[in-house]
A protein has these predicted regions:
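Structural alpha/beta core scaffold segments of enzyme domains
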Residues: 3-310
Length: 310
């Protein structure tokens, strides 16, 4: 590989693995077996749940113990379960190395507990949405790990999602005009994220009224280069087309801890939000000086205009 780089003489080098090399030198999402047993009343109230999680780490241990911890934390979902037991294990085998992928253990257990909720709803003849709404954690409830819930909005999220897709008006299954088989489904989950941590962004308003966002949050398919401009556009009341993102370059972009753990929208997004709020204040102060009025007599409107008090 080193010789190939020398031969390239400064040009980009592409490394392509063969099939054997792919399995020997790279990683995969760890296989997992999840067994879940749930106690529930006839009216759909959850009373107990026992979960056993078995991760296959492959030949070496990387992030598997942390993935296992994360999965155990989220194994019961965002539900009120007065009696719960979770046993989570990581095994080493002679297989391909497994490690963390998107979701960090939550993707797998969410699939398990939401499929369990659907099966319970089916057996009891209860609407899957109503079963979830009946059991979701709300502010003041105590989760299975002893945490007191403070900012839970799962109920509101479910209700909003159901309203947006017309849940009550749709049958469970149907065929559309083109002959495609269609169905409906709804699910919810909770995830431990990398909080608290530090994120910085730089938001610059240019002379022509366009906006430039500098952030070290890396775009890898999760949509951060779309999300951050959307937050800025909504905050400043300006067109999305007038906002651009700087390429990530650690030499010039502000510090960000990592682009991991579902943290970019919350951390970088809030940093952009606060920066845009500061821009609004600065523009109002400049306008007050320009027109010789008191700063409190100048406001920034939702559609991006600065106006004085009539």
């Amino acid at each position: 590989m080193y010789k190939r780089q020398l031969k390239a003489k400064g040009r980009p080098v592409k490394l392509t693995y063969g099939r054997d090399e792919e399995f020997a030198a790279t990683v995969c999402r760890s296989p997992v077996h999840i067994h879940m047993k749930t106690g529930v009343k006839r009216d759909g109230t959850l009373t107990a749940q026992k979960v056993e999680i078995q991760w296959d780490a492959g030949a070496y241990v990387t992030t598997n113990p942390r993935v296992d911890y994360n999965a155990g934390f989220a194994a019961n979902g965002p539900y009120k379960i007065p009696n719960a037991q979770v046993d989570a294990y990581v095994y080493m085998t002679n297989k391909t190395l497994g490690t963390a992928y998107r979701g960090f253990g939550v993707t797998e257990v969410a699939t398990a507990h939401e499929r369990q909720m659907d099966r319970i709803a089916e057996k009891l003849g209860i609407d899957p949405l109503e079963l979830r709404l009946k059991n979701v954690l709300q502010n003041g409830d105590v989760g299975i790990t002893g945490e007191i819930m403070q900012t839970m909005a799962v109920k509101e999220c479910l209700e909003t999602a159901a309203a947006n897709i017309g849940w009550k008006d749709l049958p469970d299954r149907w065929t559309d005009e083109e002959g495609n088989l269609c169905g409906k489904g709804i699910a919810c989950f909770n995830k431990l994220t990398g909080t608290p941590s530090t994120t910085s962004v730089l938001v610059k308003m240019n002379e022509n009224g366009s906006l430039y966002i500098m952030s070290a949050s890396t775009e890898m398919g999760q949509g951060v280069t779309t999300t951050l401009p959307q937050i800025a556009a909504e905050t400043l009341g300006m067109a999305l087309e007038k906002i651009s993102m700087a390429p990530v370059d650690t030499a010039i972009t502000p510090y960000d801890k990592t682009t991991t753990s579902s943290r970019s929208t919350f951390h970088s997004g809030n940093a952009v939000l606060e920066a845009c709020e500061d821009i609004k204040k600065q523009l109002c102060r400049l306008a007050a000086i320009k027109f010789g009025v008191a700063p409190e007599d100048v406001t920034y409107t939702a559609d991006g205009y600065i106006q004085g008090r009539a």
